[in-house]
């Protein structure tokens, strides 16, 4: 199977926080990456630091920020799915799975990255991951692409075990930082603090730009 990475996440900036290193490493190998972003994050509370957005302008700003971040990561196949922020958990399960199945069948990925259902903390994260997995369960097990997931709950290792995919992303840390910077409304204040902590070599913050970890989804059929 030809290599092709498909990232399916609910919000602009989810990809930059959690998957930018993986994306950049694959693009450096000239492996195509498709990013399907379910919403524009238009219900987000952050409006820049200092404020430069408002509730009316935020959707278009976040759309452009997403486009800018994808340019930083060299993603040339960005698909905006047009779902409403903070509503994914209320959508019909099969309807969401239909959307994910259509993308998967079109892209024919060798690798899918999404949130691990039940370990996304945010309801949209879990609903997105659940929809992807539901779509994949419709396929024969041997026809499912490799699927790795982000898990950000505090009990993730207790429930899932240790992450089995650990990527060294130090060589693309600058790309990850620039992708995060692109999401200005969401990250400016945080990045100022982060960069100060990085200067002081605070270990917890430094690991953000040293490695990304994922869990291979465990099928139960």
UniProtKB/Swiss-Prot annotation:
Pfam families: PIG-L. This is Probable N-acetyl-alpha-D-glucosaminyl L-malate deacetylase 2. Its cofactor is Zn(2+). Keywords: Hydrolase, Metal-binding, Zinc. The gene is bshB2. It catalyses: (S)-malyl N-acetyl-alpha-D-glucosaminide + H2O = (S)-malyl alpha-D-glucosaminide + acetate. Belongs to the PIGL family. Gene3D superfamilies: LmbE-like. Zn(2+) binds at residues 11, 14, 125.
